[in-house]
């Protein structure tokens, strides 16, 4: 069975480098927020062309701390899409804020037109969380412009889109603050949980840095309320310091595979794969949009050919039983997409033979 991902497919150099780093870190006796973390923060800030990067324990923590750093709290309204897996919602509800949902475009990204409409007619929105879903950067520049004109903070959730870029900058450089996940399956993945925050604003960065460690300004001196214990460890940072040097090549390999999948679908007018061939897309996931009612049939075709599939994501946030959804409004595009999405394997260590087998399955879709 071709898996959705296989994290064990490491090169000899990668494996040896990780073991060597692990040995050095163990011997150093410095395991949390040490020299490797400091180096990674500098490397990430340089890559994004922003002034500040703050390493944290996970992408979800990055969202939570970012919202708190902007002063978002209980009773505030935060705009987000309902189709991005619930990660932004988790952070929004954890700080006591309420979501207002913005519909998406046909590729799953936040609709700037719908955001503009909501900003003009809805209760005061304090922040927008824009998730760059599937590896696309979406309408980041227009969303940033809408937020700036309305005096609304913009949080870019770049968990799936590190390295995606427009002519004017990278994902993570348009908002007031941006968040990253380095969960192992991400384009830039660690070997455990890890995340980061990036911002051009020094004051916001100082708040985020304090909030990641209890709200301390110095050891045992609390200057910010609602602090967390969210620190990146040295091993994760050492892995990320190596892998960030290769992120553009990793993203290019992902795009090359996506292009082959897209070409394999050229004979089908009813099935498409989300993405585009260019720097605005880093091919985090291979997401098909299937005809209404045909997803199960196509899923079975892949299963019969020994190819794993998934759904990103099967339940919209406002349909989740565990969320208090707050200001619910219709999101017809998101609702239509959710029942039609099917994810196929797309990761950089797919073998050429596996890519051919997946392309064969795509070419065999007859709807």
Positions of PLM-derived features:
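N-terminal "arm"/small-domain region of PLP-dependent enzymes with the aminotransferase-like
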Residues: 1-30, 345
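Phosphate-binding glycine-rich loop
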Residues: 30-77, 91-95, 101
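Short beta-strand->loop structural element characteristic of the AMP-binding/adenylate-forming
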Residues: 80, 97-107, 310
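Active-site phosphate-binding strand-loop segment of PLP-dependent enzymes
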Residues: 107-190, 196-198, 343
């Amino acid at each position: 069975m071709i898996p959705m991902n296989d994290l064990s497919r490491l090169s000899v150099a990668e494996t040896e480098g990780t073991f060597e780093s692990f040995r050095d870190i163990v011997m150093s006796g410095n395991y949390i927020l040490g020299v490797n973390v400091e180096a990674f923060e500098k490397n990430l800030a340089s890559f994004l062309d922003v002034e500040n990067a703050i390493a944290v324990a996970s992408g979800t923590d990055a969202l939570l701390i970012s919202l708190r750093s902007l002063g978002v709290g209980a009773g505030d309204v935060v705009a987000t899409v309902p189709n991005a897996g619930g990660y932004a919602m988790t952070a929004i509800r954890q700080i006591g804020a309420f979501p207002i949902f913005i519909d998406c475009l046909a590729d799953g990204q936040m609709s700037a037109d719908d955001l503009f409409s909501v900003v003009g007619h809805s209760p005061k929105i304090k922040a927008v969380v824009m998730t760059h879903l599937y590896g696309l950067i979406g309408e980041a520049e227009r969303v940033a412009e809408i937020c700036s004109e309305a005096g609304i903070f913009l949080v870019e959730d770049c968990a799936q889109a590190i390295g995606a870029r427009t002519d004017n900058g990278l994902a993570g450089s348009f908002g007031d603050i941006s968040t990253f996940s380095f969960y192992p399956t991400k384009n830039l993945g660690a070997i455990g949980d890890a995340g980061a925050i990036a911002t051009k604003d020094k004051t916001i960065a100082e708040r985020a840095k304090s909030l990641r460690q209890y709200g301390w300004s110095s050891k045992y001196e609390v200057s910010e309320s609602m602090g967390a214990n969210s620190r990146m460890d040295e091993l994760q940072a050492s892995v990320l310091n190596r892998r960030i040097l290769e992120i553009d090549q990793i993203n290019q390999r992902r795009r090359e595979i996506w292009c082959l999948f897209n070409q394999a679908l050229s004979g089908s007018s009813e099935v498409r794969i989300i993405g585009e061939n260019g720097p605005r897309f880093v091919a985090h996931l291979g997401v098909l949009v299937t005809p209404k009612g045909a997803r199960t049939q196509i899923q079975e075709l892949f299963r019969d050919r020994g190819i794993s599939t998934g759904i990103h994501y099967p339940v919209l946030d406002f349909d989740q039983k565990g969320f208090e959804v707050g200001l619910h409004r219709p999101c017809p595009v998101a609702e239509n997409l959710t029942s039609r999405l099917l994810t196929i394997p797309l990761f950089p260590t797919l073998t050429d033979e596996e890519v051919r087998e997946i392309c064969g399955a795509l070419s065999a879709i007859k709807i």
